[in-house]
Amino acid sequence: MANTPSAKKAARKIERRTAVNRARRSRVRTYLRKLEDALTAGNKDAAVAAFKAAEPEIMRAVTKGVLHKNTASRKVSRLAARVRKISA
């Protein structure tokens, strides 16, 4: 438990940031889940639309510090390859 006033304030701030980051991470996972569902269903149009919606959301998570840049790029690259494969 925090003892000093500054440590107590820092703990409160961390709690707030954690809640925000948890919501952002959940939002990204939701977009990824929708894309995954479209890919497994084999629905080309839905997969393309879901990918176009998911990519900016993933990259936004990078700018907000939720995901590492390389992790996001790897995810986008692999998802794009899967979408291209289903579109061909």
Curated annotation (Swiss-Prot):
GO terms for biological process: translation. It comes from the Bacteria. InterPro entries: Ribosomal_bS20, Ribosomal_bS20_sf. GO terms for cellular component: cytosol; small ribosomal subunit. Binds directly to 16S ribosomal RNA. Belongs to the bacterial ribosomal protein bS20 family. This is Small ribosomal subunit protein bS20. The gene is rpsT.
